[in-house]
A protein has these predicted regions:
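Eukaryotic phosphoinositide-binding membrane-targeting regions
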Residues: 2-171
Length: 172
């Protein structure tokens, strides 16, 4: 991987797709120390900001980018190009958290327009992924057993590298 341009790096045996910023004017300067970096520990997430040592518990909807360096950066209000400083990214979207738990995430980014087929590049759990179109339809608000048929079909056809996770509560 070292020495290759990001578009030639390999993720899970495939070539990574890098998404350019389609709206350079949206890459406005912002306070960089206000942008969060996401970390996870099992199914709990924490945010770190700038040089602070404090951890924050995410508890709202955030705009995120996955940089070509592998960091997931987020902010509740800044736009994707501002967070990424206009640079190309591995993925961009929105993520909703509830007291440190990821509820859902999507490819909702009009400036990068990442496709669902490369959603695994975001580094977030695929079982909580919804396409932007599904979010607009409100399908992300349904119980997890009612995954949209369009996404289920893609998973079954192997278009998205999704691992099945065992169900909790004895399979109910």
């Amino acid at each position: 991987m070292q020495g290759l341009p990001p578009s030639q790096n390999h993720l899970s045996g495939g070539t990574a797709r890098v998404y350019p910023n389609l709206n350079p004017a949206a890459a406005v300067p912002v306070e960089r120390d206000q942008i969060f970096r996401l970390t996870s520990f099992f199914d709990r997430y924490r945010l770190f900001r700038g040089q602070e040592r404090s951890q924050y518990v995410p508890n709202s909807k955030y705009v995120f980018v996955r940089t070509t360096g592998g960091d997931t950066l987020l902010h509740p209000r800044y736009r994707h190009p501002a967070i990424a400083e206009g640079h190309p990214v591995l993925y961009a979207g929105e993520a909703q958290f509830d007291n440190g738990k990821l509820k859902w995430w999507s490819n909702g980014s009009g400036n990068y327009r990442p496709d669902p087929a490369h959603a695994a590049q975001a580094g977030l759990p695929m079982d909580q992924f919804y396409t932007y179109e599904d979010v607009l339809k409100g399908l992300h608000a349904r119980p997890s057993e009612e995954k949209p048929a369009s996404l289920q079909a893609k998973m079954l056809l192997g278009r998205n590298p999704v691992r099945s996770l065992p169900r909790r509560n004895g399979g109910r």
